[in-house]
Swiss-Prot record:
Record-given protein name: Protein transport protein sec23
Keywords: Cytoplasm, Cytoplasmic vesicle, Endoplasmic reticulum, ER-Golgi transport, Golgi apparatus, Membrane, Metal-binding, Protein transport, Transport, Zinc
One example GO MF annotation: GTPase activator activity
Family that this chain belongs to: Belongs to the SEC23/SEC24 family. SEC23 subfamily.
Location of the protein in the cell: Cytoplasm; Cytoplasmic vesicle, COPII-coated vesicle membrane; Endoplasmic reticulum membrane; Golgi apparatus membrane
Organism this protein belongs to: Emericella nidulans (strain FGSC A4 / ATCC 38163 / CBS 112.46 / NRRL 194 / M139) (Aspergillus nidulans)
Any one cellular-component term (Gene Ontology): endoplasmic reticulum exit site
Topology in membrane: Peripheral membrane protein
Amino acid sequence: MDYEGLKDQWSDVEDRDGIRLSWNTFPSSRMEASRLVVPIGAIYTPLKERPDAPLLQYEPVTCKAPCRAVLNPYANVDVRARIWICPFCLMRNPLPPHYKDITESTIPPELHPLSTTIEYQLARPAPAPPIFVFVVDTCQEDDSLKAVKDSLILSLSLLPPNALVGLITFGTMAQVHELGYTECAKSYVFRGSKDYNAKQVQEMLGLASGIRPNMPNMPQQPVRPPLGAAARFLLPVQQAEFQITNMLEQLQRDPWPVANDKRPLRCTGVALNVAVGLLESSFQNAGAHIMLFTSGPATEGPGLVVSPELKEPIRSHHDIDRDNIKYYKKALKFYDALAKRAANNGHVVDLFAGCLDQVGLLEMKNLANYTGGHILLTDSFTSSQFKQSFIRVFDKDANDNLLMGFNASLEVLTTKELKVTGLIGHAVSLNKKSSSVGETECGIGNTCAWKMCGIDPSSSYGIYFEIANQGGPAAVQPGPQRGMMQFLTYYQHSSGHFHLRVTTVARNLSGPAGDPTLAQSFDQEAAAVLMARIGVFKAEVDDGPDVLRWVDRMLIRLCSRFADYRKDDPTSFRLEKNFTLYPQFMFHLRRSQFLQVFNNSPDETAFYRHVLNHEDVGDSLIMIQPTLDSYSLEHEGSLPVLLDSASIQPTHILLLDTFFHILIFHGETIAEWRKAGYQDQEGYENLKALLDLPKEDARELISERFPLPRFIVCDAGGSQARFLLSKLNPSTTHTTGGYGGGVSSQTIFTDDVSLQTFMDHLMKLAVSGTS
């Protein structure tokens, strides 16, 4: 099959199963696997929307312990003997009684050849309805606070009627509002400068023993269950929408005076600690979201990231490199401990920042990364970017259920040929050992199961594997041999039931050494994203230059292994079609904001890396290598063009999509025409249409994206054009003179190497056989 045919096939599999593999044929020996350079890995999107797929209303049929694999199309079923043979452990299992009517022609949905992904609604109900605790910073300007209040009031109408809602506000103090008390506004106040442990939080809120705080403990009084106690702070939306709306509307700015040379006292750490403690006491392993809305950095109490003195700037990447960080390590330790507690309880923490300066996302990032929460970084809560992104969190499916899963976990099973080495994505390890766990570690390893807590239809995970057997194929069996993996995703659906989604993947094992099917099975797009995740994972612990060297080394080794060339002759270097884009993906990854921190704040770096680790192959590739489309009067519609400075032409409009930004760039001549107002004159309708077309395309891109990208319209020579110039391959720089690119293309002032220079060096090193 040619490359285009294979791409279509992989695309069909992605639509059906939500999975892309770096290699679609598995090497048959560990030796062969080590020569592949790029690890065997999968980008898996467990909740990928499949509107036409049935939801099975019965329990899955599973293999005996310890295997526990779920019945799937690859199982051998003996209809007459009513048994099935598990393809993972080869054990024989009886079919349950209700399968008595199956025949060769009438089989249940889970055995249908195309049912490689199937979803079950389990009988187990959720322990509680979905819970949302809003944690709101009151140290902000009135218009900003009003925007948050309006967004929260609007979100109440989007929640399921039985959802429980709580409210915590914080400034100099943290206040837990007792929504169940209707006589007047009543709240429990925590000092912003004090570090409370879980027991103290629960005692102060009267949750520890089910009695009200400051009440004598009457021996004859029965102890109320903790759920009843927490119900004072968490009320169902349908019952308390009026009270909650009232409470939100009455929220005022923090009254504590702030001097001109000081930052407001903001106890973000205490507020989050109280929120985690409140849910921990009564709702362990119940689906919940803690949503933080902060408009500045924590300046008081545990988790503070900068002092209240304005003369002291918040830490930069430069400070971190020089270890000039006063509060960083202590704050990181505090928030990481909170994140682990939240993840263990199955609770999600979402971080929404509305501030031009940094708010301390770098320190808080694992609250979202460990729990599958959202991170949203915006300049202000009054911006449409925040308002529209926040509402999209509550998107619903056709049955009016929220498109979010709670309290999720993922388990991976493999046949004996494969072992799982780890996962890179928003999850924590469940420390589950099995025969499927590999010896090496890539990402979060030494386990075959992870807890994700929050999961949505675009949550994607990089899962990495190794080959188990040492030699060639063991017992020679007739026909091609297969390696298999099964992904089991348990999650609490917003309808109130637990669901299980099962995806089973089988791929052929390669033949003897040098089998050409291995190279043909390489999916360069999935491989680039899997390697980008490893790069970002390394960048969190290693120095930037070391990570770039690793990216280069792996690329040179891959090209040495799979390119056609004569030794020491760079001009003879050729790559097969399914490898040709991989070097340029790596070129753009090296220059991207994921690995280059220059010009970004630590908070921005944390945000960008968070989003990369959440998206599927298609969206991740846009982040790594943005798309560029050109519009001109010479052709209809848009034309994809190279992400290159030579693509800038005076009579063209460019549309750049970096995932985080959507930018419309008017060439010099077009900008002059527009400023002269030609498009409003008779006879220039085609110019008006040309100016409108990229806006329509941009609107379409923005309409289906989360978080909402920043929309920029700029002209050649304008200051905003820097967003475009920083992404382009600098083929025409101040050093190339008149030789590189056309006369009319843009000169970029940079010392970065161009893609051509990068490729020349790559070929030279690859053919020399040294990495």
